[in-house]
């Protein structure tokens, strides 16, 4: 029971980090975009090393869910004018956080002694496949939006 509470706590804190960064991006642009790598790495570390009872597939899906939530949130609600130049910058910051997040996820999954290699392999392979699918479908999401406040 204590491990399940630790898992819930880690995932909740990781979600809070992502939401905080999205709020920073909305109200204090471009801070949220610039802190994307930091937020993604912190969320990944919290989930990979802070959970004890989750299977590798659920670890991968939880991390991917938060990364995709962060990406969609920034593309739709980040402050400023959303144009192609900003989208390129956002994708650069996304990949600067995505690569270390993937490496940390692989390390955490491989270190897990409770599961077999088939499940570990599937968990490692679906991360880039699902992320590539997301970027293929939603790479232009949010173009043309405009959010502006006097203080940013």
Pin down the residues of each PLM region.
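Canonical alpha-helical transmembrane segments
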Residues: 37-61, 69-75, 104-108
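Short, aromatic-rich membrane-interface segments at the entry and exit
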Residues: 27-39, 55-59, 118-120
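Short juxtamembrane and helix-loop transition motifs at transmembrane-helix boundaries
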Residues: 1-4, 15-29, 50-58, 82-86
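Alpha-helical transmembrane segments of polytopic membrane proteins
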Residues: 22, 29-43, 86-101
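Juxtamembrane "helix-exit" motif on the non-cytosolic side of transmembrane helices
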Residues: 21-28, 71-83, 137-145
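Short alpha-helical packing/oligomerization segments
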Residues: 71-109
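C-terminal membrane-adjacent module
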Residues: 101-152
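Alpha-helical transmembrane segments
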Residues: 6-22, 59-67, 127-130
């Amino acid at each position: 029971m204590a491990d399940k509470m630790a898992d819930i706590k880690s995932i909740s804190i990781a979600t809070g980090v992502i939401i905080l960064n999205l709020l920073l991006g909305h109200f204090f642009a471009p801070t949220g975009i610039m802190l994307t790598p930091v937020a993604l790495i912190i969320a990944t570390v919290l989930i990979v090393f802070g959970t004890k009872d989750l299977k590798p597939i659920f670890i991968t899906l939880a991390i991917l869910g938060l990364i995709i939530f962060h990406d969609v949130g920034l593309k739709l609600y980040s402050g400023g004018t959303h144009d192609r130049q900003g989208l390129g910058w956002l994708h650069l910051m996304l990949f600067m956080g995505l690569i270390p997040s993937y490496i940390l996820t692989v390390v955490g999954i491989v270190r897990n002694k409770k599961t077999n290699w088939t499940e570990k392999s599937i968990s490692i392979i679906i991360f880039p496949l699902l992320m590539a699918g997301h970027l293929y479908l939603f790479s232009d999401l949010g173009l043309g939006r405009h959010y502006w406040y006097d203080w940013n």
